[in-house]
């Protein structure tokens, strides 16, 4: 009976929407990192497309939306991007790659936190009925999403940028 109960617990957990969402996010995060590490046009397009899919999972990424994502940068970066595209055929600047990578990390961390909350809930069920929580799989390990900056920190950053 213990095996059947643990199997049912695992099945119920895997049926939770957050389980699928987390595993989709995990795969997308790995694909984004791999695409950005290529530092070439195909990798850039793959990473940018995957970022757009993460932001709106059920959507089809249109060329115009992809262009918006890839041009998201300040004027200096856009100028650098244009020059790089002209000379090397690359699509994203190093700064844009870092920003895409950081966004991917933050989205993955947030998904991991939600996954771990739901997993903890099921671990509680397992303990209550004297079952092994190991059947749920490993928890997400990684950084938590960054905390929102304080109002003072935001004001200090604005002041620092004004002085430049």
Model-derived features: positions:
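Terminal short linear interaction segments
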Residues: 141-164
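A sequence/structure-level signal for intrinsically flexible, low-complexity segments enriched in small
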Residues: 1-148
């Amino acid at each position: 009976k213990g095996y059947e109960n643990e199997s049912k617990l695992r099945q119920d957990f895997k049926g939770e929407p957050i389980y699928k969402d987390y595993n989709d996010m995990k795969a997308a995060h790995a694909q984004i990192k791999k695409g950005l590490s290529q530092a070439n046009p195909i990798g850039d397009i793959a990473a940018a497309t995957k970022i757009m899919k993460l932001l709106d999972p059920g959507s089809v990424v249109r060329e115009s939306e992809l262009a918006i994502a890839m041009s998201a940068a300040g004027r200096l970066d856009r100028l650098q991007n244009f020059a790089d595209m002209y000379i090397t055929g690359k699509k994203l600047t190093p700064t844009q790659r870092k920003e895409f990578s950081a966004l991917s990390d933050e989205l993955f961390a947030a998904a991991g936190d939600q996954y771990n909350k739901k997993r903890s809930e099921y671990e509680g069920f397992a303990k209550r009925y004297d079952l092994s929580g190991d059947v749920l799989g490993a928890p997400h390990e990684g950084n938590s999403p960054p905390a929102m900056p304080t109002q003072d920190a935001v004001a200090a950053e604005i002041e620092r940028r004004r002085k430049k």
